[in-house]
């Protein structure tokens, strides 16, 4: 905006063509219905998990490594003071819960649920019962619930992150289950790596950083995929879990929280690795 560039809001991207050419094109529909055709030096697909740009890179919107999980998060927003000074991640016999804060008066909370559950199937009283049952030892501060939704769990990495003069970043390139809190962290890392590559390409005519982008980004992506899967499997109760599975899971959790090395690894991965570790 400060540079006076032509930024368009409310635009729907329809397709990307010419990834193999020197001038790829984006076809889109403007907020007023105007048909747009944009000739570009490079196209960055930062258009989310239903990416249009992904088709130009992988050949389809679904081309990638994929895993879906047998549980979801039931999320609520409520008007209440914080129940804790810190985040609460809870693994209980009743399933997982996350107690987080938005502000001094609005709180965000989640509990593990079936992916196909109807968000309107519970009364407010029942929702508080589900949440409280999953955080034994903590008394939740309740208040009016003004938003509820169900968040499905998926892991995805596109087969390719770049084709010609089109590259993917963020959720267009990968998605992770939210347990590890890695989605935004990964997206920012992608953008930093690709910005360096595009600067070298456009200002120095050096394609080597761009050629290296898929492999460089992938190393970090798969570390984050593992961490997100690990946190998810360690903290959630699988529908088919046996008594052995549950006891082993608790043993795994204790192995982490009772070990300085385990706590250090979790903290390092949760907050994000230095970008240089992916270079």
Q: Predicted segments — roles?
A:
Residues 191-194:
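Active-site-proximal alpha-helical segments within enzyme catalytic domains
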Residues 5-6, 166:
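Short, conserved active-site loop motifs that form the nucleotide-linked donor/cofactor pocket
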Residues 2-5, 11-14, 21-37, 42-153:
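Conserved FAD-binding catalytic core of PHBH/FMO-like flavoproteins
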Residues 152-158, 162:
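Acidic loop->beta-strand submotif enriched in PP2C/PPM serine/threonine phosphatases
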Residues 181, 196-279:
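C-terminal helical "tail/cap" subdomain of flavin- and related membrane-associated enzymes
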Residues 46, 170-171, 189:
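Active-site flanking residues adjacent to catalytic metal/cofactor-binding acidic residues
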Residues 178-188:
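A conserved FAD-binding loop/helix module that cradles the flavin
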Residues 160-178:
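Short FAD-binding loop at a beta-strand-to-alpha-helix junction that anchors the flavin cofactor
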């Amino acid at each position: 905006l400060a540079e006076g560039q032509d930024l368009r809001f409310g635009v729907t991207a329809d397709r990307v063509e010419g990834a193999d050419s020197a001038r790829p094109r984006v076809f889109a529909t403007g907020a007023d219905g105007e048909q747009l055709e944009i000739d570009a030096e490079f196209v960055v697909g930062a258009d989310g998990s239903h990416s249009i740009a992904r088709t130009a890179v992988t050949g389809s919107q679904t081309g990638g490594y994929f895993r879906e999980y047998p549980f979801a998060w039931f999320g609520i927003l409520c008007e209440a003071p914080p129940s804790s000074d810190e985040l609460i991640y809870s693994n209980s016999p009743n399933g997982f819960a996350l107690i987080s804060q938005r502000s001094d008066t609005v709180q965000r909370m989640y509990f593990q649920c079936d992916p196909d559950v109807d968000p309107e199937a519970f009364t407010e009283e029942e929702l508080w019962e589900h949440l409280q049952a999953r955080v034994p030892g903590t008394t939740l501060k309740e208040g009016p619930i003004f938003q509820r939704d169900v968040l499905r769990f998926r892991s995805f990495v596109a087969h390719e992150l770049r084709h010609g003069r089109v590259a993917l970043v963020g959720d267009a390139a990968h998605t992770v289950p939210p347990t590890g809190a890695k989605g935004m962290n990964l997206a920012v890392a992608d953008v930093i790596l690709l910005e360096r590559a595009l600067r070298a390409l456009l200002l120095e005519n050096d394609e080597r950083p761009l050629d290296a982008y898929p492999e460089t980004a992938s190393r970090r992506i798969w570390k984050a995929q593992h961490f997100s899967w690990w946190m998810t499997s360690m903290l959630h109760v699988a529908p088919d879990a046996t008594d052995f599975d549950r006891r082993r899971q608790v043993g795994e959790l204790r192995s982490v929280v009772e070990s300085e090395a385990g706590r250090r690894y979790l903290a390092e991965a949760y907050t994000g690795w230095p970008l240089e570790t992916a270079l």
